[in-house]
Every structure is written in C-alpha cells, then in structure tokens.
C-alpha cells in the first residue's frame, strides 16, 4: 500500500510539474550540437521541444555522423572542406589506435594525439560555420529566443555571444573538469578526483598529491585544446576575447550527472542534474532479437558493445575476446562491424547494430560488456545489469572506477587482458549475487525521482526562452582569483598581526633597554672605577 501511495505521489508531482510549464509554446531555439554520441541525449531534448510546438533550427555540417533529419526540427546545413570518406577515415583511425600498445610514459601523449584526430575535424566544422557568410546572415535574421549547445567544443558558446542569445549547455564534463570552474562551483582537490586519474573520492595521501598536480595542469590543458577557438572568437567578434569568460555568461547547465553514480560534490543553482536522460522505457524487441533471447534458455544473454567509435578490433585481440565468450554458457550478442573472428563460438552472434537499452531491460540479460561510455553506463544502471567494463578513452576509465567502487562491475584493461581474464570477469558478475544486488540498488535509487530527467531538461530550456536567460549567476565570476580564495583578506589580517607583533616586540625591547640596560651600564662603570 505504501509503495502504491509513493508511486501515486510521484505521478501526481510529475503531472503537476508538466501542467505548470505546459502552456508556453512557440519560441525559436537555435541548436549547435556536437556530432557523435553527444548528440543522442541532445536529440531527445530537441525532439521533445519540437513536439511541444517550438520552432527549432539545428546547425549541421554537410558531412556528419548522426545528425539526421527529423520532423521535430529543421536542419540548417553549412559546407565543410572534407568529404564522407575523410570523416570515416578519421573515426576509424580514432577507434583503431586505442588498441595499440603504449607505455606508461607515452600513454598520455598517445591519447592526446589520438583524440586530436577527431577534435581537429570538429574545429574545422566550427571554423567553416563561423566563416560562412550566408549562414551567419540567416542566424542574425532568425530572431531566436535562446541557444542550446554542447560546450565540449565552444562553437555554440561563441555564436551565443555573437548573436546576443541566452544559452543552455548540455554537458557531461570537460576533459579538464572546468565546467565547475566556469560555473563557479567549489571544486576542492582534497576529495574530488580529477579527470583521467581513475581515483575514487576516498584518496590516499599519494593519490591526493597526484590529484593536486593534475589539477594544476587543467588550465594549461584547456588552452592547449581550445586556444584555436579563442582565435576564431576574436575573428568573429572583432575584439579581444578571453574564452573562459564566454562560458560564464549566465547559462543554465544541464549536467548529465546523478549522484547515484557520480561522487557527491557541490554544484551551483544554475546547474540542473539530468543524469540518465538517455534511459527510455524499453520497447518491444524485434523478432530477430527476440529469437536470440528465447533461444538462450535458462542461462540468458550477455550484451556486448564497445560503442559506435570502435568499428574493428585487431585480429589477435578479437580472437582472444571470442575465445573468452565461448567459455560461458550464456548467449552473447556482440555489436561488431569488423571481420568475423575465425574462432567465434556457437553461443556468440555478431550484429552490426543492436537495441542496447531494450536488450538491457530484458529479464534474461545477465551481464553487459561495455566500453564505459556514459550513455551505456546509465543504461546499465537504469536496467539493473552488472557490467564488465573495458574502458578505452576519455572519461571511460573514471566511469568504470565509479561503478567498480560501488560493487556493480569489474574493470579490465583491454590491452592487457587475456581470454581467461574476460571469461572469469563475466562469470564473477553473473554468478556472484552481490553484483546484481548492488546494481539493482543503484537502479532503484536512480529511478526514484519526482520528475523525469527529460521533463526537467525541457522545462529549463523553455525557462531560458521565456525569460531570456535569468539563470542565477554566482558573484564568484566577478572576483579575481585572489579575492575568490580570500588571499587579499588573509594578507591584510596577516599584515595586521605581523605589525602588532613587530610593534609589541619593539616596545618590549625598548622597555627592556630602559629598565635593564641602564643598570648594566651603571654597574659596568662602577667596576671600572674600583679597578
């Protein structure tokens, strides 16, 4: 009865929430997306806004990966100086290089160079957009009410300044954790692990030392990645621009966070948490996949996907993986577009695409092998499926650490693991009941919320359009770094203390000299007369 009452209360809250913001329709929204998996969550929000009657324009490079047509929005296409073949080559190179061996010292440099293969292409997209006169003329005449963008690449941030539009940012996290610096959130290194460290929020002293040093590198890394965008901003705006200040122009941050998964940390009032927004209620399986699931018998299935960026795995590693999958009794559905491993077992089926969320929501799914991208991690949490994680790049190592810390999965190094390592990890998360219990607890906590993340995101985009911004802006943005840390106050008080101490010392020294120095001189003079 209590459960039914609780469910009814949540439903009532959701209905009331929707009713309160369901009357304002018909605003114009400009969307500057980032291609690839970043677009998937943004697309859900954009289509929900389009379904509510808003006029939405999405800026799309003529060569793209996932930015397809939709009845819910209009695409404005701008030219880019490369073709589909070059784009495919860049993405393929990006995926393949994550399987090359690297030393501990060369790892960060290799990771940086590999990421730049794709990041340079995104920069070319931005450069082409900001230099395309027809598109800029169209945007100036568009009379948009707000701009919605993914600030991982700051093209939309620059356009918002150029057009004078309030902004909404949909974001997972900069490679340098600077969303909190830009947003004004306290970000202490003592318990908030920095990106790429693979630390938890319970750090040892040596880990805190490393965390502190990594924190010092974040600003240089930001300028290393984004200095070219600052040059673009100067070119477009015809004035000197400090790129970080553009991120601080009163945006609403829609952060794909949920503290069920993330480590707890302070956030600002203009930061809205919508983690798990990509988790939809599972649809009905197609006949093809239903047949796979039904044929699995009592052992069930394992879902395996390394994301859209990995199209092929080196033959030796693919054969090791295939050998491992053949050692478990479950049926394995492996999303893989590369060459078929010669030793592929009878229990393993290769598919070019799979309905990941629907399969994870099936009661016969026993485990999820994932590269630990945030979309896959949240789908695993939503559906309560324990995970074997093979992180490859970016924030995936940190995501895997979070799940492992909560006892809901096992992490393997994809370059170093053996066939037995993978097989044993699968058997562990499937047969050890604690992994299922822990992920089910995370799932229960994650889904127990008064408002769905998609509804919350739509509300805040409409809020910005209605009020032309109005996000709470912390005064921290107006302070210098030494004011923010109260170093001027500390220096002033320290100066007072030192001055008082100095004056006190001088007074004491003077008094000592007057009281005892004179007696000493008199005694010395008396002795000299006697002699």
From Swiss-Prot:
Pfam families: UDPGT. GO terms for cellular component: endoplasmic reticulum membrane. Keywords: Endoplasmic reticulum, Glycoprotein, Glycosyltransferase, Membrane, Microsome, Signal, Transferase, Transmembrane, Transmembrane helix. SUPFAM superfamilies: UDP-Glycosyltransferase/glycogen phosphorylase. UDP-glucuronosyltransferase (UGT) that catalyzes phase II biotransformation reactions in which lipophilic substrates are conjugated with glucuronic acid to facilitate their inactivation and excretion from the body. Essential for the elimination and detoxification of drugs, xenobiotics and endogenous compounds. Involved in the glucuronidation of arachidonic acid (AA) and AA-derived eicosanoids including 15-HETE and 20-HETE. Conjugates small planar phenolic molecules such as 4-nitrophenol, 1-naphthol, and 4-methylumbelliferone. Glycans are attached at residue 294. Induction: By dioxin. Its EC number is 2.4.1.17. The gene is UGT1. This is UDP-glucuronosyltransferase 1A6. It comes from Oryctolagus cuniculus (Rabbit). The chain crosses the membrane at residues 489-505.
